[in-house]
Amino acid sequence: MSRIADNPVSIPKGVEVTLSGDNDIKVKGAKGSLAFAIHPLIQVVQDGETLRFSAKSTDKRVNALRGTTRALINNMVQGVSQGFERRLQLVGVGYRAQLQGRKLVLSLGYSHPVEFTAPEGLTIEVPSPTEIIVKGYDKQQVGQAAANIRRFRPPEPYKGKGVRYADEVVVRKEAKKK
């Protein structure tokens, strides 16, 4: 059983955490602000520069929910202070990306260019034509935007062509033999 909920979340300098009575938490920092509704069976206590989590029940599901809540709030604190980024690579002949304002234009071997508009709160950088960096303060939103870009052309197993995460390992298949 994981004991992740037993570890307190430390609040760095420059991050302001507000707990309201109706189980809402607001985290505000240099990069932005996030809000989260805490489950009624989970209690969050702020003592100084740390947040502690306790369950109002001894049920296994409530303990699991306590760990999930702790992880989500830790991601919120980390996001508003440092931010998150996800790197993508374009592998394939003629596969390239370019940025036009807030719009990412991808050439992925289709008969038409694929366009992706960055949601509010996210920034997209294209340091080279085959590299994309998605940055933001909401971890879930950064990961979802990167997954949406990857979904336009996921890596195929025979040649490895497609859009992949920078740290992704594509398991290759052998071609059919006659």
From Swiss-Prot:
InterPro entries: Ribosomal_uL6-like (IPR000702), Ribosomal_uL6-like_a/b-dom_sf (IPR036789), Ribosomal_uL6_a/b-dom (IPR020040), Ribosomal_uL6_bac-type (IPR019906), Ribosomal_uL6_CS (IPR002358). Keywords: Ribonucleoprotein, Ribosomal protein, RNA-binding, rRNA-binding. GO terms for cellular component: cytosolic large ribosomal subunit. GO terms for molecular function: rRNA binding; structural constituent of ribosome. It comes from the Bacteria. Pfam families: Ribosomal_L6. GO terms for biological process: cytoplasmic translation. This protein binds to the 23S rRNA, and is important in its secondary structure. It is located near the subunit interface in the base of the L7/L12 stalk, and near the tRNA binding site of the peptidyltransferase center. Belongs to the universal ribosomal protein uL6 family. HAMAP family: Ribosomal_uL6_B. Part of the 50S ribosomal subunit. This is Large ribosomal subunit protein uL6. The gene is rplF.
